[in-house]
Amino acid sequence: MLCWELANRRKRIGPNRFGFPIAILTRQQLIEVLYTALSDKSKVKTGKKVVRIESEERRITTWTEDGSEYEGELVVGADGVHSVTRSEMWRAADNQQPGFIQEEEKYSLSAEYSCIWGLSTPVPGIRQGEQIIRSYDRLTFLIFPSQNGCLGWFAIQKLNRKHVYPDIRPFSQKDTLARCEALRDLPIWNDVKFGDLLTLTEVCAMTPLEENLFQTWNYGRILCIGDSISKLTPNIAQGANTAIEGAAAVANGLHQLLHHNGLNQPSYDEIQEVLGRYSQSQRKRMKKLHWISHMVTRLQSREGLINKFVGRYIYSHTGNSTFYLTGKMIAQGPVLNYLSTPKEIEIGLRASFDQYGKDGGDMPWKTTIMFIALLTIVVLIYSFI
């Protein structure tokens, strides 16, 4: 079991590493902030579910459920794990270049875990700002602070078998309630049990946790980003972050192309070059994050003999390494390179990570040694299997 007093650490480490204090907010709040800051809101169309995309060499056209039609140069799909954009990209490739998308890729999405997530009002026994990871065999509780002492939480549990797309069914409210009741009496932190969170929960749902890094990210004038092409579990909390990174990296490539072309319309081949370069570089980064996410998910749920041993006897002694390593992962991501970087970020995010662990919140030497020991044990055990 791990617990951080995030409220105190974010005041000290946040400005040193990122240039600004760390703030915790819901995705809805983030979207509201971003939307409010838009100078031209007319380009944001809500209630426009895309049902069809036709990609041609000179143009691309999308049709929505309400009959609207939009024509342009490029479609970037950030429409989640059940992506219509991805399906339409596959359809276009199958029609225009049969065999370009391998059949095994279309069935590479799978789920081995489920996740119950919820938002609770302040729970007595959990102090404001505390972030908790509680591990059991085949089960992990993640509790993190939100605004005004409220708590966001995940209960991530190993499924009885691996489900492969399209055999990944959603869970009903009845499934959610039954699973919650089965976990109600499990301790979370000191005298706090999972049932104490449930009693104060305002919203709760259950979903399968799909995992996959697709091979093909773009075809024609179609590009996929975020969960539509790279689906992580929430254990390392990088799903939304990497989707935003993807949008930034695409914007960098397009800005460079438009700046180079001036008033000339980008050609089909030029757009292909930008999309291909983006897919290659971002997929390389995501491959590393997928490996980390896969490993952490199974370590925290103590899946298998190795993870059970490491999870019980080593992981709980690694201190704040997760906090620091997550910060380093974020620092290595792309940023918008055509906007001036605020001085605070330039100093905090770039310079401090060049000397990782030597700024205002250095990683304890005991933690470093513990992590080296953990990795050594894992490598040795795997070498004899």
Swiss-Prot record:
One GO cellular component term noted in the UniProt record for this chain: membrane
Kinase listed as a keyword: no
Bilayer disposition of the protein: Single-pass membrane protein
Membrane-spanning residues: 365-385
InterPro entries, sorted: FAD-bd (IPR002938), FAD/NAD-bd_sf (IPR036188), FAD_mOase_fung (IPR050562)
Residues holding FAD: 27, 227, 240
Cofactor field: FAD
SUPFAM superfamilies cross-referenced by the UniProt entry: FAD/NAD(P)-binding domain
Keywords: FAD, Flavoprotein, Glycoprotein, Membrane, Oxidoreductase, Transmembrane, Transmembrane helix
Pathway membership: Secondary metabolite biosynthesis; terpenoid biosynthesis; Mycotoxin biosynthesis
Gene3D superfamilies for this protein: FAD/NAD(P)-binding domain
GO molecular function: FAD binding; monooxygenase activity
Glycosites: 320
Domain of life where this protein originates: Eukaryota
A Pfam family assignment: FAD_binding_3
EC numbers for this chain: 1.-.-.-
GO biological process: terpenoid biosynthetic process
Subcellular location: Membrane
Purpose of the protein: FAD-dependent monooxygenase; part of the gene cluster that mediates the biosynthesis of the neurotoxin verrucosidin, a methylated alpha-pyrone polyketide that inhibits oxidative phosphorylation in mitochondria and thereby causes neurological diseases. The carbon backbone of verrucosidin is synthesized by the HR-PKS verA, and further modified by the other verrucodidin cluster enzymes.
Similarity field: Belongs to the paxM FAD-dependent monooxygenase family.
Protein name: FAD-dependent monooxygenase verC2
Source species of the chain: Penicillium polonicum
